[in-house]
Amino acid sequence: MDLYLDTADRGPALALLATGAFRGVTTNPVILQRAGLTVADAPAVHDWAVEGGAERVFLQSWGSTADEVAERGRRLAALSDRVVVKVTATLAGSTACARLASEGVPTLLTGAFTPAHAVLSAGVGASWVAPYVSRIAPDEATAVDVVVAMHRALGAGPTAVLAASLRSLDAVGALAAAGVPAATLGVPLAEALFTHELTLAADGTFEEAAAAAP
């Protein structure tokens, strides 16, 4: 499973990218807003993410019509070949996604909640589809099952699931075990990968033994 960082907060993102565990960052207008930014800051986020080692930077287009979404998507894609343009799974967004995909722009259909959305994403040529795991169902196990069904619906085709809005590392592990190829983690969840209590206890034991060596 490829892991991404669901943040536009520069400091934590760069620190986590430096671990080598994450392929890039995913953003949307809300994530930008939470970092004190706006959609106008997307190019700057792209620049520092790429400088920090991101192989892919997911930037979201927006608009009330397919023309608006597609045109803004083209501008985002022009930043570099590492950009993946995100669009929502609305009529306008899906239409724009199909246009961008036909032009060779890597795309992700976001705001997905059902296996039918996975079918839609493949139909419009999206490279990825992003289900919001925590919003699919109150029960995490049920939500994971739905995302696995989305993954299976796509089969071996060119569209892949990138699971988003995850609340636990258990869900990440379950999705990875089922073959889901990618997930994006918020900063607290990403940091939790490195702070399991048993891992920290083992590390402390190793450090004590090393310090006791003559």
Label for each model-derived stretch:
Residues 28, 85, 121, 175, ...:
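Conserved, mostly hydrophobic/aromatic
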Residues 154-214:
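C-terminal alpha-helical cap/extension of soluble enzyme domains
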Residues 20-24, 79-82, 96-108, 123-130, ...:
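Glycine-enriched alpha-helix->loop->beta-strand junction motifs that scaffold or abut catalytic
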Residues 4-6, 34, 58-65, 82-91, ...:
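Catalytic beta/alpha-barrel core
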Residues 1-56, 62-70, 200:
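Conserved N-terminal beta1-alpha1 strand-loop-helix module at the mouth
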Residues 11-19, 68-72, 96, 114-124, ...:
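Catalytic cores of alpha/beta
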Residues 24, 29-34, 111, 127-138, ...:
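Glycine-rich phosphate-binding active-site loops on the catalytic face of alpha/beta enzymes
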Residues 43-57, 78-80, 94-106, 142-161, ...:
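Alpha-helix-loop-beta-strand connector modules within alpha/beta enzyme cores
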